[in-house]
A protein has these predicted regions:
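Conserved active-site tyrosine of GNAT-family acetyltransferases
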Residues: 25-30, 86
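Conserved short beta-strand elements that form part of the metal-binding/catalytic scaffold
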Residues: 35-69
Length: 93
């Protein structure tokens, strides 16, 4: 189970990401960032533990920052260690 975040006035409350392969995204984010996931059928999953609640849905067309999509910035207390961790799980930086 997860804690529900208290809604904050005029703050982003929930974000959704399109993915051709939500399962692979979940495996990556769980292994690298410790997020947890709650599936609602095979094509939608909510994520928790990211500092913001959100979801991932299966889609044939996905947004990419290079094409003008949103750029999401994650914080790290140890950038080199975080970089090594995500690279070890197949990320491209």
């Amino acid at each position: 189970m997860h804690d529900i975040l208290e809604p904050r006035h005029h703050m982003i409350d929930y974000v959704e990401f399109a993915s051709a392969d939500p399962q692979t995204m979940c495996v990556f984010y769980e292994a690298t960032l410790g997020w947890s996931f709650e599936w609602f059928g095979p094509d939608y999953v909510a994520f928790h533990g990211a500092g913001l609640e959100g979801g991932i849905y299966r889609a044939d067309i996905v947004s990419r920052s290079a094409d003008g999509g949103a750029l999401i910035v994650l914080n790290s207390r140890d950038l080199e260690a975080s970089e090594a961790l995500v690279l070890s799980h197949g990320a491209n930086i």
